[in-house]
């Protein structure tokens, strides 16, 4: 015992075979925790002893012990239950081959049943062997006393082979003979920063927080590893060999008429500035009031023909444009142009500058004062940077903007077989190479089609691309996690995208095929460079308003920077996180609805009604499909901290006062069964050219790599409806479907961060119907005053009786609850006995009549699982799956 206790307190050094003593060491437990959290394991697996919350995977506390214990698993291939040792080999298999053996629940209501095959298999491309070992050492600490592994395990860091050129460094973004502009979060700046790399090896960062340059460096431009790995959220690194000349406060900060530095810290603090986040979260002054008092705004940037940006912003009555150039010899020139309605001051930070000169205005006591002007005038400030310039290594090749042929190939089986209804097939669209001919991470999360057939594809980290005449071409450089796109013209030359920091209008104003104008439509909301602060949308209504969704934040290092409202993960850092918002045609920002958690889908149905898809979690018992209506509350109270005058301590926003104000959802999407992370909708408006699903909403799931069909109805003023599986085994996480002019369905997918069952990090697949084959399936389910009417896509065979068919149906039901715990178990689960059934005269539907249906209060606000267990012989010679299923949410019974 004494020996074991001593080992528990030690830091264990472990040297790799042949490792040199001089190699860098790292703590594998600490690294394992980072990987565990960044891959989202913490969401599905509890690490707390005896945690009662409902999770989709087993509790890891007390699982991997010093003396390995037994645990029970189920082998899906044959249904066999057996016991295995929870040792290192089992751990490795549970990560690499997670579907080979499913853990059996050891406690609670699900004790004795196997967890679902939800966790994807993590290949080495997603979690390296080195990181896998680190996670092992981390999970070994999740036990009591001597059964736990050491709290610190020091390992040797493996040296990466030297790169022949910057193009060989993974995720390195070099600069050739054209200026490059990227939206990134850099250390020491806000998450809304714009990084600019010049061809001469000089780079700088313009930060909209101060409307000023904040960082200057030479050498390598950027390396986007931190943004392209797992869930991102860490500050982006500078390029290889970078040397910093200037960083910290603003270099040339505009001043208000009162002489104060323009500072938007309240809505965009510096990356990982916990102190500022806590300050403004608990401050009673509202964001809208701070914006009005500051009376300034960032307006975007315009690119010259060589790619150099001119930054546009407004301070009071003055609209200004600023350009920055850094010469080979380190001379910095900042030009400010504008028609000044009032005198404009700038505070200059002179640290690291020499030979400061101005052309126009007066520089005195560190303030550059520009006079009122009746016309547009340009004034310049120049200075020399201290220190020598660091050269960039020569590139073996330059950029190539030549359009690339779009290649399509039959979709190969992924981690699971691709299952689609008979008559449907899938093609994979091969992603384009980047400008330097390298394979790139290409996550197509925004797709739209112009009237002339141009397809616009926005991505998380690879920029915005267009497909014209069967060829890919890059339209706009790196956007910051773009998750949606709307086309404003007929050709795809004028678009609006979402990015984490803002809603942006992007324009090709000179017709050369490349975007040159980036207009900030809206950034009047909080963005803290948090990995979970996604901006979903936008979508546009007929009046020209743009609607978008702001996810809650998740700080993996602190529970004080966001208000989690008693929950374990997601919370608001203020600034309308957890809200649906809109921006009007004249640029006015308007909060629209609140109570959102992690909404990942939004769209207008063919009748013009707005809907959104919500992800399961705190205050959201399971994922759901809901009409999005102005002024309504949707369940998660964290976002209420953005209401006027509210702070986390305000009694007015505590859950008991809001739980009965919930806008009820229309359709539950059962967690672990159909959807864990539902994405964007696409309605079938093809007029039958995609099959028999006219008017239905197609929604994918990012985790399960599935495609679903949703049909809703309104009964007695209540929304409700059914969801039916359409496809399984897509290549990655399904996020953005869109119907193309040829009536096929193009599906943008991403598996990064929230690993998907499909297994791939990214994918773009096209689903095509052969135009003739209609498989037998459940088309949808509707409510009847006596039960449920199950509608089929093909008529039942003439010899099938109602009683015989009803005997093959199994109907069960349950309900979910919404509280601060992560998700909800299935409450009051029961099997429904059928008192009768009736087949319609056209044999396209059957009405199932549960015993006692409608009597008492036990029927409503429940989800009903309708399972046709054996379809053999039911639909003649029509192709059909062995079993059919649908889930129906019942909120009201027809009278």
Label the predicted regions:
Residues 158-163, 394-774:
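Beta-propeller domains with acidic blade repeats across secreted/periplasmic ectodomains
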Residues 157-321, 331, 362:
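Beta-strand-rich N-terminal accessory domains
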């Amino acid at each position: 015992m004494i020996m074991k206790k001593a080992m528990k307190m030690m830091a264990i050094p472990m040297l790799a075979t042949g490792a040199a003593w001089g190699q860098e060491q790292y703590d594998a437990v600490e690294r394992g925790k980072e990987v565990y959290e960044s891959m989202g394991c913490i969401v599905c697996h509890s690490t707390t002893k005896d945690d009662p919350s409902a999770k989709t995977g087993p509790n890891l506390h007390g699982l991997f012990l010093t003396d390995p214990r037994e645990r029970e698993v189920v082998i899906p291939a044959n249904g066999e239950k057996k016991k295995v040792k929870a040792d290192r080999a089992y751990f490795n298999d549970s990560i690499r081959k997670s579907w080979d053996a499913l853990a059996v629940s050891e406690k609670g209501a699900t004790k004795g049943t196997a967890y679902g095959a939800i966790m994807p298999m993590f290949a080495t491309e997603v979690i390296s062997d080195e990181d896998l070992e680190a996670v092992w050492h981390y999970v070994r600490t999740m036990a009591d006393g001597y059964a736990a592994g050491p709290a610190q395990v020091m390992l040797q860091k493996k040296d990466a082979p030297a790169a022949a050129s910057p193009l060989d460094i993974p995720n390195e973004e070099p600069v050739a003979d054209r200026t490059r502009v990227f939206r990134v979060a850099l250390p020491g700046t806000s998450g809304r920063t714009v990084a600019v790399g010049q061809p001469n090896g000089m780079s700088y960062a313009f930060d909209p927080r101060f409307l000023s340059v904040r960082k200057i460096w030479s050498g390598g431009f950027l390396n986007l590893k931190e943004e392209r790995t797992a869930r991102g959220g860490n500050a982006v690194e500078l390029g290889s060999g970078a040397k910093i000349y200037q960083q910290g406060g603003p270099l040339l900060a505009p001043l208000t008429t009162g002489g104060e530095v323009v500072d938007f810290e309240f809505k965009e603090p510096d990356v990982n500035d916990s102190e500022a986040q806590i300050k403004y979260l608990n401050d009673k002054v509202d964001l809208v009031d701070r914006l009005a008092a500051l009376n300034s705004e960032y307006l975007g940037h315009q690119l010259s023909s060589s790619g150099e940006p001119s930054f546009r912003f407004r301070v009071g009555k003055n609209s200004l444009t600023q350009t920055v150039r850094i010469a080979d010899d380190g001379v910095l020139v900042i030009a400010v142009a504008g028609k000044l309605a009032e005198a404009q001051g700038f505070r200059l930070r002179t640290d690291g500058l020499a030979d400061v000169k101005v052309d126009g205005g007066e520089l005195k006591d560190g303030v550059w004062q520009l006079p009122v002007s009746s016309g547009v005038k340009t004034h310049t400030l120049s200075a020399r940077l201290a220190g020598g310039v660091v050269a960039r290594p020569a590139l073996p090749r330059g950029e190539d903007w030549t359009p690339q042929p779009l290649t399509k190939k039959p979709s190969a089986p992924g981690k699971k077989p691709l299952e689609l209804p008979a008559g449907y097939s899938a093609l994979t669209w091969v992603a384009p190479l980047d400008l330097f001919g390298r394979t790139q991470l290409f996550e197509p999360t925004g797709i739209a089609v112009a009237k002339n057939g141009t397809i616009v594809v926005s991505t998380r980290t690879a920029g915005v691309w267009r497909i014209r005449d069967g060829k890919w071409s890059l339209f706009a450089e790196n956007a910051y996690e773009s998750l949606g796109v709307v086309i404003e013209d007929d050709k795809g030359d004028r678009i609006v995208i979402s990015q984490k920091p803002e809603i942006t209008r992007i324009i090709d104003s000179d017709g050369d095929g490349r975007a040159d104008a980036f207009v900030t439509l809206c950034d009047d909301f909080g963005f803290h460079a948090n990995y979970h602060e996604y901006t979903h949308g936008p979508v546009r209504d007929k009046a020209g308003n743009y609607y978008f969704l702001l996810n809650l934040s998740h700080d993996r290092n602190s529970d004080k920077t966001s208000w989690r409202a008693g929950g374990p993960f997601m919370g608001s850092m203020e600034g309308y996180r957890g809200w649906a918002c809109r921006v009007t045609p004249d640029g006015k920002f308007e909060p629209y609805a609140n109570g959102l958690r992690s909404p990942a889908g939004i769209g207008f149905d063919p009748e013009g009604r707005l809907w959104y898809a919500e992800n399961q979690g705190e205050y959201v018992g399971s994922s759901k499909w809901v009409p999005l209506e102005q002024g309504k509350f949707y369940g998660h109270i964290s976002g209420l901290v953005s209401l006027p005058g509210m702070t986390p301590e305000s009694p007015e926003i505590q859950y008991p006062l809001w739980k009965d104000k919930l806008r009820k959802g229309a359709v539950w999407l059962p967690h672990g069964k159909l959807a864990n992370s539902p994405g964007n909708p696409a309605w079938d408006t093809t007029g039958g050219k995609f099959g028999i699903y006219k008017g239905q909403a197609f929604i994918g799931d990012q985790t399960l790599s599935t495609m679903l069909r949703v049909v809703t109805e309104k009964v007695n003023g209540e929304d409700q409806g059914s969801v039916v599986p359409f496809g399984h085994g897509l290549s990655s996480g399904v996020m953005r479907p869109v119907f193309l002019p040829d009536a096929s369905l193009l599906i943008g997918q991403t598996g990064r961060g929230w690993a998907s069952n499909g297994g791939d990090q990214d994918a773009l697949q096209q689903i095509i119907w052969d135009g003739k084959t209609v498989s037998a399936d459940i088309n949808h389910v509707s409510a009847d005053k006596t039960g449920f009417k199950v509608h089929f896509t093909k008529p039942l065979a003439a010899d099938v009786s109602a009683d015989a068919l009803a005997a093959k149906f199994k109907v069960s039901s349950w309900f979910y609850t919404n509280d601060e715990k992560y998700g909800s178990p299935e409450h009051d689960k029961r099997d429904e006995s059928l008192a009768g059934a009736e087949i319609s005269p056209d044999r396209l539907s059957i009405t199932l009549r549960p015993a006692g249906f409608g009597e008492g209060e036990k029927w409503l606000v429940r989800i009903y699982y309708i399972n046709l267990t054996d379809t053999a012989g039911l639909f003649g010679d029509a192709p059909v799956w062995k079993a059919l299923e649908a889930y129906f949410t019942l909120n009201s019974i027809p009278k």
